[in-house]
C-alpha cells in the first residue's frame, strides 16, 4: 500500500530551547507556542510491503526523487524510538519519498515538517490495521510520535496555533504532544502573514541537539524556563484582545532571548549574522516611522 501526507513547518513565538533528559526522550524544559507556516511544507509518501525478515528495519529513502543516504540515520533513529509504540512497523519494508517546498537546513525547521509528515503516514498504516481508531487518537498519537523524531515536529501535526509543553492555564497541554491552542484568538491573528528571510543560505554551524544540551549547565537556564511560562501566560489575553504592541514585545524578546542563551552558554556560539542585525534594525526603523505592526522572530539558525 501507499499513503501520502503533507505537514507544515512552524515558527515558535515562545521558544523551545532545552530538554529534560531525566524525564525521557524529547521532553521540553519549557512550554512553547508556534504559528503554523502553511506554505512551507514537507510532502512525504510512504509505500509499504510485507517482508520476510522481521528482525531489522528495512527502508529506502528518496529526497526529491533521489536516494539520500545521509538522511537515513535520522530516520533509523526515529524508527527505533517509535518501535515500542508501533511494533507492527518491523513487518514492512518502506519506501519513503519526501520533498520540501523550502530549502533544507536553512533555519526553517524541515525536521519539524518532515517528522510530522512521516508520523502521519505511519499512523495511516496503524489506522488501516485498526479502522475504528478515532480522529482525536490519530492526531494526538501522530504528534506524540513526531516529537520523538524532532521535538518541534509535534507542533506541525494539527492546528494553526499550537502549544507543546505543560502549561497550567492551557487545558490539555502536555510535554508529550502538541495541542491546538483552544482559547479565543482575535481576528487580527487569523490572517497574520509570516515572511521568511533567508539571511545566510548555508547550513547552521551548531545543530539544535547540541544547542539544547548546552542548556543543562547554563547559568541562566532556570530563569529562562520560568520566563517561557510567564510569556505564554501573557500571550493568552493578547491573543484574545488582539493587542499587537504587546504581542510584538513578547515575540521579539523571545527571539533575542533564544540567541542570548546561545551566546552565554559554554561553549558559546553566535548563529546570527551581521545581516540579521541589519534586518532587525531596518524593521525597528520602519515600525517606528510608519507605525505598521510588523515584527521579527528568529529561528535557531
PLM segments and residue spans:
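ATP-binding N-lobe of GHMP and related small-molecule kinases
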Residues: 1-106, 120-136
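Structural beta-strand/beta-sheet cores of well-ordered domains, especially the beta-sheet scaffolds
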Residues: 3, 9, 31-33, 42, ...
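A generic structural signal for well-ordered coil/turn residues at beta-strand boundaries
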Residues: 7, 29, 40, 158, ...
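Residue-level signal for inorganic ion chemistry
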Residues: 44, 247, 299
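Long, hydrophobic, well-ordered secondary-structure blocks that form the structural core
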Residues: 96, 104-156, 160-163
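Active-site-proximal beta-alpha loop/turn segments in soluble metabolic enzymes
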Residues: 103-105, 265, 301
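ATP-dependent small-molecule kinase catalytic core of the GHMP/sugar-kinase superfamily
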Residues: 134-288, 292
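Acyl-group transfer acyltransferase/transacylase scaffold of fatty acid/polyketide systems
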Residues: 294-301
Amino acid at each position: 500500500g501507499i499513503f501520502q501526507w503533507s505537514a507544515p513547518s512552524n515558527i515558535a513565538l515562545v521558544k523551545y530551547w532545552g530538554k529534560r533528559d531525566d524525564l525521557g526522550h524529547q521532553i521540553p524544559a519549557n512550554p512553547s507556542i508556534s504559528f503554523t507556516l502553511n506554505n512551507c511544507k514537507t510532502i512525504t509518501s510512504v509505500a509499504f510491503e510485507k517482508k520476510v525478515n522481521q528482525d531489522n528495519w528495512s527502508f529506502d529513502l528518496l529526497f526529491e526523487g533521489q536516494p539520500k543516504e545521509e538522511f537515513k540515520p535520522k530516520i533509523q533513529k526515529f524508527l527505533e524510538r517509535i518501535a515500542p509504540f508501533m511494533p507492527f512497523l518491523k513487518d514492512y519494508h518502506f519506501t519513503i519519498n519526501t520533498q520540501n517546498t523550502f530549502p533544507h537546513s536553512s533555519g526553517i525547521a524541515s525536521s519539524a515538517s518532515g517528522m510530522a509528515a512521516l508520523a502521519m503516514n505511519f499512523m495511516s498504516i496503524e489506522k488501516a490495521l485498526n479502522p475504528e481508531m478515532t480522529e482525536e487518537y490519530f492526531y494526538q498519537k501522530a504528534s506524540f510520535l513526531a516529537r520523538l523524531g524532532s521535538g518541534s515536529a509535534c507542533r506541525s501535526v494539527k492546528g494553526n496555533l499550537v502549544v507543546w509543553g505543560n502549561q497550567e492555564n492551557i487545558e490539555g497541554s502536555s510535554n508529550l504532544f502538541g495541542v491546538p491552542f483552544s482559547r479565543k484568538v482575535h481576528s487580527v491573528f487569523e490572517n497574520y502573514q509570516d515572511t521568511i528571510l533567508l539571511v545566510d543560505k548555508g547550513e547552521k554551524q551548531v545543530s539544535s541537539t547540541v544547542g539544547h544540551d548546552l542548556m543543562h549547565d547554563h547559568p541562566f537556564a532556570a530563569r529562562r524556563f520560568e520566563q517561557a511560562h510567564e510569556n505564554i501566560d501573557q500571550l493568552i489575553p493578547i491573543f484574545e484582545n488582539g493587542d499587537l504592541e504587546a504581542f510584538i514585545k513578547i515575540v521579539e524578546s523571545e527571539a533575542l532571548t533564544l540567541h542570548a542563551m546561545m551566546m552565554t552558554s559554554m561553549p558559546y556560539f553566535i548563529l546570527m549574522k551581521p545581516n540579521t542585525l541589519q534586518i532587525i534594525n531596518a524593521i525597528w526603523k520602519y515600525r517606528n516611522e510608519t507605525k505598521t505592526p510588523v515584527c521579527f522572530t528568529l529561528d535557531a539558525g
